[in-house]
From Swiss-Prot:
Binding-site list for ATP: 608
Chain positions of motif 'KMSKS' region: 605-609
Compartmental location: Cytoplasm
Catalysis performed (reactions): tRNA(Ile) + L-isoleucine + ATP = L-isoleucyl-tRNA(Ile) + AMP + diphosphate
Highest classification ranks of the organism: Bacteria, Pseudomonadati, Pseudomonadota, Betaproteobacteria, Neisseriales
Function: Catalyzes the attachment of isoleucine to tRNA(Ile). As IleRS can inadvertently accommodate and process structurally similar amino acids such as valine, to avoid such errors it has two additional distinct tRNA(Ile)-dependent editing activities. One activity is designated as 'pretransfer' editing and involves the hydrolysis of activated Val-AMP. The other activity is designated 'posttransfer' editing and involves deacylation of mischarged Val-tRNA(Ile).
UniProt keyword terms in alphabetical order: Aminoacyl-tRNA synthetase, ATP-binding, Cytoplasm, Ligase, Metal-binding, Nucleotide-binding, Protein biosynthesis, Zinc
GO CC term (a single one): cytosol
Name of this protein: Isoleucine--tRNA ligase
Enzyme Commission code(s) on record: 6.1.1.5
Quaternary structure annotation from Swiss-Prot or TrEMBL: Monomer.
Amino acid sequence: MTDYSKTVNLLESPFPMRGNLAKREPAWLKSWYEQKRYQKLREIAKGRPKFILHDGPPYANGDIHIGHAVNKILKDIIIRSKTQAGFDAPYVPGWDCHGLPIEVMVEKLHGKDMPKARFRELCREYAAEQIARQKKDFIRLGVLGDWDHPYLTMDFKTEADTVRMLGEIYKSGYLYRGAKPVQFCLDCGSSLAEAEVEYKDKVSPAIDVAYPFKDTAALAAAFGLAGIEGKAFAVIWTTTPWTLPASQAVSVGADVVYQLIDTPKGKLVLAKDLAEDALKRYGFSDGIAILAETTGDKLENLHMNHPFLERDIPMLNGDHVTTDAGTGLVHTAPAHGLEDYAVCNKYGIELYNPVNAEGRYIGETPRVAGMRVWEANPVILQWLEETGNLLASSKIEHSYAHCWRHKTPLIYRATGQWFVGMDKAGADGKTLRDKAIKAVDDTEFFPSWGRARLEAMIEGRPDWVVSRQRYWGTPMTFFVHKETGELHPNSAELLEKVALKIEEKGIEAWFSLDKSELLSAEDCENYDKLSDTMDVWFDSGSTHYSVVKQREELEWPADLYLEGSDQHRGWFQSSMLTGCASSMGRAPYKQLLTHGFVVDGEGKKMSKSIGNVVAPQEVYNEFGADILRLWAASTDYSGELAISKEILKRVTESYRRIRNTLSFLFANLSDFNPIEDAVQQADMVEIDRYALVLARRLQERLAGDYYPRYAFHFAVKEMVSFCSEDLGAFYLDILKDRLYTTKADSRARRSAQTALYHITRSLVLLIAPILCFTGEEAWDIIGGGEEDSVLFHTWHEFPTINEKTEAELVKKWTAIREAREAVTAAIEPLRADKTVGSSLQAEAEITAPEEMAGYLNALGEELRFAMLVSKAEVKVGSELAVAAKASDGEKCERCWHYTRDVGAVAGYETVCKRCAENVGGEGETRHYA
């Protein structure tokens, strides 16, 4: 008896169904590094238009977390897709190396008692160790870049160019020195940038305090009264009693209506909208009378006594006064609040600051001298009670600024700092705020809501405090006059001389510099060397100048900055401000892309204490980096990205669908040589031409739309759908019969293989930016071998087809697919009751509208192959309907169709006439399916 299994074209796939990624990926990485893939790619891409994604530098401290992984994976997908789109897209990874967290770690490891030069040396060594650890993990994720030559903000050249950027801003006229209230961390002992502040709930005392009016006659006149008997008080409400020793004024709203109210305490001035609630707080229900009303502008320049100090307190009109809460009168301490500072500055009131850098009151402050501010609250409340000026006291929970490092409450404290002014006219007469808002208009945002967010932040932000009182940072390399505080008149030239020294020796060149090396003897007498360092956000915010503008392979401005949504306050903004404040005069990027934060499967923030942290190292060691990459790509990053073991298992199913499809495709291409065996499109079987159209349209959507607009979750969805629906459930299902049963070298089979070849090359190129390991594994088979890379090639070129022909083809096969789905549905009940097993055991009678019936009848004898049944007939009717039944034919041992001609050919007793022809004759021909 003949064994017909040897006559079918069942070939082994060179692409295994099991990826075994976690085990195999490291070996691929080693091979790519040895082949110098990144360097070869730079040579191949030379001369193409550039696409520059500038890397926002992660901080060089600790292991990478899942947020880092998402960020680097998204960047890598873009770099790879742009490369395959025909761009030269170099990627230079970077690290942020200066700043307090590294200082804290070095102090923990080595203590504080050492020369500052040695301390900075240890900081540099620590940062280098952290970078080496992080780099290893980033490479393991498959991120392609110039890892041998990353940029570090502690590189001597980068430090020097950061100093040059400071010089740019100085020359532009935006830099100034001032004593202004800034967010100050008592644990850091330093001012904080906006991006270093986070808000958490805090319980604070909420108190109502009476300020006695000095001149009740003037108060009466303001309310239109002839006179006032007894004492009168302005009542303020505050949640920061510790700021009262610095109180220098009381602010009222010019348009706010105020009432003069007679109470058991005396005459009180309160905002009309808040008076009722305030009086309840004071326990006043009887003996109350409203004497008069007036507006805040009439109260301007009245004077009061401080509630417990001997100090004159003027009443000012302030735009910041509201009637949302409190009393409508605001105690004003310019040393401890930006709005307070602004209103006092307008009235020419000189700032008084009783709190030092340790958060302690200076010696001249009665009762609280030497105390830390938080310790002073109960003392001040007691003091107010003694003077009779505490009307009410309670506790309130409210959102309050905290240090992002120490998680401790911040204070506003006036310090001598260096600022980049937002509303100061620069050398060109324009303010930095106006320039930055225009730059926002000129930037493209992904997602689009990022524009309004960044614009609102720039509109509302204070001047940028760029100085820090730390040791490990890029120095502010200025010489300051000892008496006037003015910068040296030759500061621009001196900055460049210092920058040249820093290029050679790093920042230590400044800290060890003797003034006499650069200044005359007279200047040495009159000028001090500034000891401040720069805000680390100035370091990273200047990398568009120190890196993008300096490195030969890059181009300024960058095409894209891509970071987490917190960077609207951080790197996006600091980069925008340095770009606009320098001679470049614009944003250093054309596009901004923002991704959300990673949360657990239930949408909760990840926390070590909760135990819901998913580490990227665990994921790639268990599942492989390609699964992590597919998860990142398949999640809509514009919101929060949820991850858990269950979610990763679902992602693995999608990966398996793609991989199994490729395994099938490669198996059926293993005896196909595209040069010798390919069939011209005009000679191809019709369904093969239709499949090519589907594949080309998929590529057009991904390469022409989803990849360019960074919509990777749509790209993944379409690829998985294409593999499962267009290929798995339709085309490949139909194709199996032709691939397996027709003659190996027949036009029918070679036509199918030609289509599969184009589909496979295109699909591998499309998955490669996301599944970089799997893409390269597949390209080793269909591309140019081990030394070749999918990245060395651009998107696949499909055979061209006439538009009209394509439209007709798609219309026809869309109708045929609809009929096929109806046939499948009609067979399901027969499968369920076990009347049939395979659909090939069934026959189908299809009733279809005239046009569809015409398409189906055009397939002739090949209709059964398209419908995946052993027999199919068509008749015209008003709507689509299918009657299915079990076939009464006999099963062919070779093709498994049920026909009435099994054994019809002598010598082929167990196979159908078609199979006998395919085995012993010239073989069948196919035109449609």
